[in-house]
Amino acid sequence: MAVFCASSARLALPTLLRNIYRSEFASELHSSRPVSLRQVSYSHNRFNNGRSFASLSRLLASQSGSHMNPQPSSQPIITESSSEQLDAAEDGSIVGAPTKDAAVNRDRRDPDKPTRKTKKAKFASSQTEPDATSAKSSRDKKHVRSDRASPDYKPKKKKEPWQIQKDALKKKFKEGWNPSKKLSPDALEGIRHLHAVAPDKFTTPVLAEQFQVSPEAIRRILKSKWRPSETEMEDRRKRWEKRHDRIWSHLSELGLRPKTKRTEALDDSNILYGKGEEGNKPSE
């Protein structure tokens, strides 16, 4: 007949599970401080595995020892140690939790207040901006110096007074202040003479239409008081005679003017066939 053993019945699996859960609930009820559900669930999930393994390891050790020396007081010791371990763990979690809650509450209180890191970053960026501008200006100065040191660099010369006046005339008269048609010295004297004899009849627009020049050119001719000397007049006369002969020979080649002995030496055919000034025929 089988004999019932009280110590072995106490170490059975249902009894062990019942004692473990009873010790856990007793330790949770033992804590006197009010803890939020969030903190309890966090601490329970954090320390649940550690407590269960520690209690089971100790129970297995006590079970092996009970077979050798059965002591009825071993089970209460295990439950007390597990309850003390749970209390210490929960106290530690409760003590450490307010620091995290305080930080969260601080952030909720001042959501718009910048942190120290953002302040330091802004201060560093404000210091780097003037440094970048100064570095850029120094680079530009070095670039200008290198351009000046290059052999192709030419410094800008100061304009002469006549250059400044010429630029001003170009801006004022975009088509050009010089007349497109050159007038001979005889034509210039004729314009001055006609305007002096009958200024009401030979006005500036009438003279400009008659000589086919701009009114500004007629106005400058009448306003000018410069008169050439005798030698200058002779040189100008010779130049205009040559110019006249050159134009006449060109028109005669085109068939617009008759050929003359005076303009025959200026024909382009003399250059083509190698005729000299004496009019020698080319050698065959």
Curated annotation (Swiss-Prot):
Its main location: mitochondrion. The keyword Ribonucleoprotein does not apply. Residues 62-184, 258-284 are annotated as: Disordered. Pfam families: Neugrin. It is found in: Mitochondrion. Residues 67-85, 124-136 have a biased composition (Polar residues). Keywords: Mitochondrion, Transit peptide. Transmembrane segments: none annotated. GO terms for cellular component: mitochondrion; nucleus. Residues 103-115, 275-284 have a biased composition (Basic and acidic residues). Residues 1-53 form a transit peptide. Belongs to the RRG9 family. Required for respiratory activity and maintenance and expression of the mitochondrial genome. This is Required for respiratory growth protein 9, mitochondrial. It comes from Aspergillus oryzae (strain ATCC 42149 / RIB 40) (Yellow koji mold). The gene is rrg9.
